[in-house]
């Protein structure tokens, strides 16, 4: 059966039995299959699972999470049944600082965060790659649905074959230096293939559901953020674009740009959240046309391929976005760029990522400022 599931060699100049591969295991089906597949192909697999949160008992009970409690046990159980070593590293303090606190502070700036990108950018890639080097391993392998294509020494990050599972949006902050050591063996398969492989390898987690939403949010977003930043639930005013008071809100944590439901305002036309003014603790609302825009400013740029001035690309403005045609332009501000969409787009949210593609290839991107 394994002949149906061929993958690119992890390294061109070494045989599998000569290659030590660190596999980041979350306890889910994807990373477990990646580890089992490589082990069966003869690679020296070492499984590593990060304990990221949940030792206080608050976060690890939610179904569909990862990297805590049951998931760590599942990863260890897979390693034992397949027959490769497995280690658990406690990264709770780093995760709290780099991801959870950033999540809360981003909300407090009136933005909508994507903690999964920050986690990949810092804990999972930056820190795990250092672990990979410290252990004298050749590569770091993950179960992400994304493809790494290498030709003539040039490495490209591309969308997964399975577009419904593609995770390239969440990996835009990966650097060329990191890609030298990273490998994504599942990018050329469909999720249904991975389920088949899980059963073929007799993995106990073959029917385990996919992880959903943000792993450390055990309750609602608002309740989680309220615990991290109590000031986010202070009452304030809801005003229109001219400053007229229309009502009162119970905390900015309950709102995000583009939101319509839950405003609690009776008005002669539908109103949407236009902006969250954290300085005045105000939620600014207005008609839908105010939320339609073409020009986007992005910061903290990461280019896997440096775009030329006015380069035509397709951009994704949220993970579920199919993509919009746009051009990329330089600005006078350091480490910022301007993206001009061909057509108006509704509800562009500061704090989200703007990821640029050239066909299937990820060019790079940045965080939306405005």
Curated annotation (Swiss-Prot):
Q: Which GO terms describe its cellular component?
A: cytoplasm
Q: Where in the cell is it found?
A: Cytoplasm
Return the annotated region ranges for Interaction with tRNA.
Answer: 165-167
Q: Which GO terms describe its biological process?
A: tRNA wobble position uridine thiolation
Keyword annotations of the record: ATP-binding, Cytoplasm, Disulfide bond, Nucleotide-binding, RNA-binding, Transferase, tRNA processing, tRNA-binding
Stated EC number for the protein is 2.8.1.13
Q: Which residues bind ATP?
A: 24-31, 50, 143
Q: Name one GO molecular function term.
A: tRNA-uridine 2-sulfurtransferase activity
Task: Name the cystine pairs.
Answer: 119-215
Q: Where is this site: Interaction with tRNA?
A: 144, 352
Enzyme class, one word?
A: transferase
Name the residues annotated as catalytic in the UniProt entry.
119 (nucleophile), 215 (cysteine persulfide intermediate)
The record's annotation in SUPFAM superfamilies points to: Adenine nucleotide alpha hydrolases-like
Catalytic activity, reaction form:
S-sulfanyl-L-cysteinyl-[protein] + uridine(34) in tRNA + AH2 + ATP = 2-thiouridine(34) in tRNA + L-cysteinyl-[protein] + A + AMP + diphosphate + H(+)
Q: Which NCBIfam families match?
A: PRK00143.1, trmU
What's this protein's family per the entry? Belongs to the MnmA/TRMU family.
Q: What does this protein do?
A: Catalyzes the 2-thiolation of uridine at the wobble position (U34) of tRNA, leading to the formation of s(2)U34.
Q: What is this protein called?
A: tRNA-specific 2-thiouridylase MnmA
């Amino acid at each position: 059966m394994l002949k149906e599931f061929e993958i690119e060699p992890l390294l061109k100049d070494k045989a599998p039995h000569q290659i030590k591969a660190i596999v980041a295991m979350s306890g889910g089906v994807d990373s477990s299959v990646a580890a089992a597949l490589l082990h069966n192909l003869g690679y020296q697999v070492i499984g590593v699972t990060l304990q990221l949160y949940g030792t206080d008992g608050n976060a690890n009970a939610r179904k569909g999470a990862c990297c805590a409690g049951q998931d760590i046990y599942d990863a260890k159980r897979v390693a034992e049944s397949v027959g490769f070593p497995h280690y658990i590293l406690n990264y709770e303090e780093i995760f709290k600082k780099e991801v959870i606190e950033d999540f809360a502070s981003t909300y407090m700036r009136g933005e909508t965060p994507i903690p999964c990108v920050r986690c990949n950018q810092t804990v999972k890639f930056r820190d795990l790659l250092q672990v990979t080097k410290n252990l004298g391993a050749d590569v770091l392998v993950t179960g992400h649905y994304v493809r790494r294509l290498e030709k003539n020494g040039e490495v490209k990050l591309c969308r997964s074959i399975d577009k419904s599972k593609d995770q390239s949006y969440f990996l835009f902050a990966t650097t060329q230096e990191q890609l030298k050591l990273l490998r994504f063996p599942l990018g050329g398969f469909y999720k249904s293939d991975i389920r088949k492989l899980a059963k073929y390898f007799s993995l106990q987690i073959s029917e385990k559901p996919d992880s959903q939403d943000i792993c450390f949010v055990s309750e609602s977003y608002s309740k989680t953020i309220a615990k991290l930043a109590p000031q986010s639930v202070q009452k304030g005013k809801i005003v229109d674009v001219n400053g007229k008071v229309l009502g009162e809100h119970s905390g900015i944590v309950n709102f995000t740009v583009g939101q319509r439901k839950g405003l609690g305002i009776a008005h002669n036309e539908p109103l949407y959240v236009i902006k969250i003014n954290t300085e005045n603790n105000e939620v600014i609302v207005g008609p839908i046309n105010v939320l339609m825009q073409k020009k986007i400013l992005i910061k903290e740029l990461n280019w896997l391929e440096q775009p030329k001035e006015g380069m035509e690309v397709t951009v994704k403005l949220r993970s579920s976005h199919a993509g919009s045609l746009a051009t990329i332009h330089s600005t006078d501000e350091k480490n910022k760029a301007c993206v001009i969409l061909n057509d108006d787009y509704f509800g562009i949210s500061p704090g989200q990522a703007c990821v640029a593609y050239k066909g299937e290839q990820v060019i790079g991107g940045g965080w939306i400022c405005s």
